[in-house]
Amino acid sequence: MAKKNSNKQQEILDYVYKCVHENGYPPSVREICSAVGFKSTSTVHSYLQKLIDKGHLQKDPTKPRAIKILNKTSQVQENRTNKEGYYTSREMVDVPVVGRVTAGQPILAVENITDTFPLPVDFVQNSDAFMLRIQGESMIDAGILDKDFVLVRQQSSANNGDIVVALIGDEATCKTFYREKDHIRLQPQNSSMEPIVVKDELSILGKVIGVFRRM
């Protein structure tokens, strides 16, 4: 059983380092589950804790959401060679993925968060941020496609031309923001779609600062 546990730890560590090496950020717990064949995220958390205890991964105790991958080879078993390792010293942060948005409720309320998306701290720009998965093709001309993840910096105001996530009723929408004479225009970046004109104040949840796509 100990050997089996060690093999699984190695498999997880190799997968994490492979993702960091290829993508610049580690996989989510759900992605690790799928990659190594686990059904429960709690099992993955248990194995990750073992890797932390062994010094392969490290969490920053002052930043509950941050994880730092140590600058060393992915070597759990003694018979692994250095050439099989991947290297990184970038500090990571788990950005919450928001599944739904409800008027009058904080965007990062626990019940709204469906997953986390690990990113280098410098991507987040030292600000509160969240991820939202895009549904539809209203922003394709801006390079934001259906099922992409947008990285959103929380803020309640915007400048003309900013791509924002705004709340209209109970629906979050991603559009380009324009404040005009007596209304706000939320412009889709798709020539086949009409803008949304809002005459009352709307709630801006944040500005889009990044786009991520799973191939």
Swiss-Prot record:
Molecular function terms from GO: DNA binding; serine-type endopeptidase activity
DNA-binding region: 29-49
GO BP annotations listed: DNA repair; DNA replication; negative regulation of DNA-templated transcription; proteolysis; SOS response
CDD domains named among the record's database cross-references: S24_LexA-like
Keywords: Autocatalytic cleavage, DNA damage, DNA repair, DNA replication, DNA-binding, Hydrolase, Repressor, SOS response, Transcription, Transcription regulation
Keyword DNA-binding part of the UniProt annotation: yes
Signal peptide: none
EC number: 3.4.21.88
Keyword DNA damage found: yes
Entry annotation: catalytic residues: S138 (for autocatalytic cleavage activity), K175 (for autocatalytic cleavage activity)
Superkingdom assignment: Bacteria
Annotated site location: Cleavage: A103, G104
Self-association and partners: Homodimer.
The protein's name in its UniProt record: LexA repressor
Gene: lexA
